From Swiss-Prot:
Organism: Saccharomyces cerevisiae (strain ATCC 204508 / S288c)
Keywords, comma-separated and alphabetical: Cytoplasm, Cytoskeleton, Membrane, Nucleus, Transmembrane, Transmembrane helix
Function: Required for the fusion of nuclear envelopes during mating, ensuring proper karyogamy. Plays a role in the initiation of outer nuclear envelope fusion.
Protein name per its UniProtKB record: Pheromone-regulated membrane protein 3
Lineage: Eukaryota, Fungi, Dikarya, Ascomycota, Saccharomycotina
Chain positions of motif Bipartite nuclear localization signal: 69-75
Length: 133
């Protein structure tokens, strides 16, 4: 039983050593790929640009590409007042007449509906009496 534990422990340490060696090799290859002709290329951790100014420009560019927002059309210039016909101002009496007409229309519609209901009830009562006789 103890022999199996020792074997397992030996396997685990071998795996750890192999993993560490792989990591060392990987780090060495990354370092060599970052340098070219003696110049070292600096990479940001997040993959973004190093400048704050270019970062702002980059964010604006991305924002425009993703959602341009509402596109507003340019308003056409209005013609001069001389060529336009001036609207006449309405008298106060004319506006009151229009309001009265509008109100009387609604009042007439309400009155007409009640009148129609009364007529139908009277006619239905007459028809019932005629059928009973």
């Amino acid at each position: 039983m103890t022999a199996m534990k020792e074997d397992n422990a030996a396997l685990i340490t071998l795996k750890k050593n192999n993993d560490q060696e792989k990591l060392r090799v990987h780090k060495l290859t990354d370092a060599s790929s970052n340098s070219a002709d003696g110049f070292v290329i600096n990479k940001a951790k997040n993959g973004g640009p190093l400048n704050k100014k270019s970062l702002v420009n980059n964010e604006q560019h991305i924002k425009k590409a993703v959602s341009p927002g509402r596109v507003r059309k340019h308003k056409t210039t209005t013609s001069s007042t001389k060529s336009r016909t001036k609207s006449k101002k309405k008298d106060a009496s004319e506006s009151k007449v229009q309001r009265e007409n509008k109100g009387s229309f609604y009042q007439g519609a309400i009155f007409g509906s009640f009148l129609g209901a009364a007529v139908t009830t009277v006619l239905s009562n007459l028809a019932v009496k005629a059928l009973q006789n």
